């Protein structure tokens, strides 16, 4: 069993039940899924760029990404409806906990001038969004093989009803929030 999942079952549920006075252990919020999205605007001119992004995302998450397509045509960007412009991965279960563990323990501390992640990036429904400026913070990415530095969005979807519950859940998992 994964380290974070084990921690959730032993410590985290206990701490949250004490703090929020839940009547049942089933009320305790948990992480439902993690969505990693990489928008590749350059893919409009050069489709090889998207292949590199898909490959990198697969290395980072350990799962084959879904290629996202444009919903609308935008003439200014020379974009047609249905053109591939990004990639996303939805992680659940074991892979989700492995990715979160790697993100918290290895990747985030590798960010330059890292002070902690923002406390205000919750959406009001208990979900947390995190933007990463470069894919090089992940240990799987080889610096020499990277053609272009790309960022990505990471959305952590929880079953928490409020932002406060979600913040407490992620803090118990060891998410380094800014002081």
UniProtKB/Swiss-Prot annotation:
InterPro entries: Ribosomal_uL5 (IPR002132), Ribosomal_uL5_bac-type (IPR020930), Ribosomal_uL5_C (IPR031309), Ribosomal_uL5_CS (IPR020929), Ribosomal_uL5_dom_sf (IPR022803), Ribosomal_uL5_N (IPR031310). One of its GO terms (biological process) is translation. Keywords: Ribonucleoprotein, Ribosomal protein, RNA-binding, rRNA-binding, tRNA-binding. This is one of the proteins that bind and probably mediate the attachment of the 5S RNA into the large ribosomal subunit, where it forms part of the central protuberance. In the 70S ribosome it contacts protein S13 of the 30S subunit (bridge B1b), connecting the 2 subunits; this bridge is implicated in subunit movement. Contacts the P site tRNA; the 5S rRNA and some of its associated proteins might help stabilize positioning of ribosome-bound tRNAs. One of its GO terms (cellular component) is ribonucleoprotein complex. The gene is rplE. Part of the 50S ribosomal subunit; part of the 5S rRNA/L5/L18/L25 subcomplex. Contacts the 5S rRNA and the P site tRNA. Forms a bridge to the 30S subunit in the 70S ribosome. HAMAP family: Ribosomal_uL5_B. GO terms for molecular function: rRNA binding; structural constituent of ribosome; tRNA binding. Belongs to the universal ribosomal protein uL5 family. The keyword Zinc does not apply. This is Large ribosomal subunit protein uL5. Pfam families: Ribosomal_L5, Ribosomal_L5_C. The keyword DNA repair does not apply.
């Amino acid at each position: 069993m994964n380290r974070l999942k084990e921690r959730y079952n032993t410590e985290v549920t206990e701490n949250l039940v004490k703090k929020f006075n839940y009547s049942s252990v089933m009320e305790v919020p948990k992480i439902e899924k993690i969505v990693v999205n990489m928008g590749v605007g350059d893919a409009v001119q050069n489709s090889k760029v998207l292949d590199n992004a898909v490959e990198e995302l697969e290395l980072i998450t350990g799962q084959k990404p879904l290629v996202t397509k444009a919903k609308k045509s935008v003439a200014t960007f020379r974009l047609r409806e249905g053109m591939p412009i990004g990639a996303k991965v939805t992680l659940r279960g074991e892979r989700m906990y492995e990715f979160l563990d790697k993100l918290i323990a290895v990747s985030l501390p590798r960010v330059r001038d890292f002070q902690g992640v923002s406390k205000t990036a919750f959406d009001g429904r208990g979900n947390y969004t995190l933007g990463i400026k470069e894919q090089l913070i992940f240990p799987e990415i080889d610096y020499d093989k990277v053609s272009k530095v790309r960022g990505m969005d990471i959305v952590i979807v929880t079953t928490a009803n409020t932002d406060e519950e979600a913040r407490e859940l992620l803090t118990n998992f060891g998410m380094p929030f800014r002081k």
